[in-house]
Swiss-Prot record:
Component of the acetyl coenzyme A carboxylase (ACC) complex. First, biotin carboxylase catalyzes the carboxylation of biotin on its carrier protein (BCCP) and then the CO(2) group is transferred by the carboxyltransferase to acetyl-CoA to form malonyl-CoA. It is an enzyme of class 2 (transferase). Its EC number is 2.1.3.15. It catalyses: N(6)-carboxybiotinyl-L-lysyl-[protein] + acetyl-CoA = N(6)-biotinyl-L-lysyl-[protein] + malonyl-CoA. GO terms for biological process: fatty acid biosynthetic process; malonyl-CoA biosynthetic process. It is found in: Cytoplasm. This is Acetyl-coenzyme A carboxylase carboxyl transferase subunit alpha. It comes from Paraburkholderia phymatum (strain DSM 17167 / CIP 108236 / LMG 21445 / STM815) (Burkholderia phymatum). InterPro entries: Acetyl_CoA_COase_a_su (IPR001095), ClpP/crotonase-like_dom_sf (IPR029045), COA_CT_C (IPR011763). It holds the Pfam family ACCA. GO terms for cellular component: acetyl-CoA carboxylase complex.
């Protein structure tokens, strides 16, 4: 698949186009231009490295939304075996913006839940652009309780712009469904490991992210509102999104510094979409390390640790100037 380049990546796109053109010419030419191709390839790699070393929060937001970025289903296919998808909330419908089911991780039975976006117009509509309705969160709750019943570790993957704000969703209890999931996850008697793989949008993300260990991919985001939404409220213009992204502190490094996440999983040069299999391999190691730390921990200790973790959020100390 041809790589889609973002606006700020245009210098890289131009170099890659030149490299592709030379490769095409080389196939029909007696002149050896392999050295020139190699030189431009190294230049492209260095340019990508320089660019990705100095990303702004707004640029990170764009990468987190990249249309070719791996989604939950992609990670399920790469990281888990014997996946058996479970459908429906047993109350209203089956929301396809949430996928989940039984699987094995490194041979160990587990439960997997995550947001799922679409690749083309038809699938995006089918998946509601990764924005769950109440029935999606209630399906997730059902699978969480199944994981608890059978003593299975729970892996969740977060990638949503937010919960669906439609009238029907509100009528069916969107806020109640999200709140219920927060309550259930806080008390679940099994290890929970959550990973933000793309967008972590507000309560729609948090509803499957109350965990014993929270990971974030290097170029993912996690915030209470989108930069555009924040800009529209504070500055009455979505054009101020770059400033809003900076103020929101939505990047993995910022959230790690605040103690809101536990680990940052490095991405391949240019982002996860440049090397999905390489990204999956790095994430596998991170998930295995996170799961290992809860091995042998009693249910009471696990829940107490989770409770202490949640209660520590937002704590601060007041100091007297000059003290």
């Amino acid at each position: 698949m041809k790589t889609t380049f973002l606006d700020f990546e245009q210098p890289i796109a131009e170099l890659e186009a030149k490299i592709e053109e030379l490769r095409f010419v080389q196939d029909d030419s007696a002149v050896d231009i392999s050295e020139e191709i190699e030189r431009l390839s190294k230049k492209s790699q260095q340019l990508t490295k320089d660019l990705y070393t100095n990303l702004t929060p707004w640029q990170v937001s764009q990468i987190a939304r990249h249309p070719q970025r791996p989604y939950t289903q992609d990670y399920i296919n790469e990281l888990f075996t014997d996946f058996h998808e479970l459908h429906g909330d047993r109350s209203f419908a089956d929301d396809l913006s949430i996928v989940g089911g039984l699987a094995r991780f490194n041979g160990q039975p587990c439960m997997v839940i995550g947001h799922q976006k679409g690749r083309d117009t038809k699938e995006r509509a089918l998946r509601n652009f990764g924005m769950p309705r109440p029935e999606g969160y209630r399906k997730a709750e059902r699978l969480m309780r199944l994981a608890e019943k059978f003593g299975l570790p729970l892996f969740t993957f977060i990638d949503t712009p937010g919960a669906y704000p439609g009238i029907g969703a509100e009528e069916r209890g969107q806020s109640e469904a999200i709140g219920r999931n927060l309550y259930v996850m806080a008390e679940l008697k099994t290890p929970i490991i959550s990973t933000v793989i793309g967008e972590g949008g507000s309560g729609g993300a948090l509803a499957v992210a109350v965990a014993d260990s929270v990971l974030m991919l290097q170029f993912s985001t996690y915030s209470v509102i989108s930069p555009e939404g924040c800009a529209s409220i504070l500055w009455k213009s979505a054009a101020k999104a770059p400033e809003a992204a900076e103020a929101l502190g939505l990047t993995a490094h910022r959230l790690k510094a605040l103690g809101l996440i536990d680990k940052i999983v490095s991405e391949p040069l240019g982002g996860a979409h440049r090397d999905p299999k390489g990204m999956a391999a790095m994430l596998r190691r991170a998930l295995a390390d996170s799961l290992r730390q809860f091995h042998g921990m009693s249910t009471n200790d696990l829940r107490q640790r989770r409770f202490d973790r949640l209660m520590a959020y937002g704590k601060f100390k007041e100091t007297t100037p000059g003290a």
